[in-house]
Amino acid sequence: MDKKRFFELIMDVCDWDQSGDDDMVIAPLVRYLSNLSDEEIFAFDDIMAELLYDLDTKKNFKRACKYYDHSDDSFLYSRCTALVNGEEYYEKVKAGKNNKNWTMEFEAILSVPMLAWGRKHNKDCGDYPLLSAKSIETGSNVDEWK
């Protein structure tokens, strides 16, 4: 899996007719990924973490705070919105050319790899074995917060 495929899956497999119910939106993606290998599920997770990490900057946080008071969590969930709106949208957010992003959240995408893995192995998603190399938490991209 690569970034292109990552964004294709989000745009083509998620049920966007269910907008407003994020769990329903991601349900088809969870089912789809659960039919792939663990390596593919983990790759999806790693790509998601990398993309979120790349948006984790002091500049973006300041931009976001112009639109409403962001906490560490809400800033993460707003970064998730950039992912679920496709690659072109993501790149605009990354370049600082789409500030509307900071008024929305899409936390549900974070659970997709864990839910898919749990479904595949008939296990609790809390037993998910991967910890991505890049942290998604706000402030993790230390170089971009200086």
Question: How should these model regions be labeled?
Answer:
Residues 87-92, 96-146:
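Basic, alpha-helical nucleic-acid-binding regions used in initiation and control of genome expression
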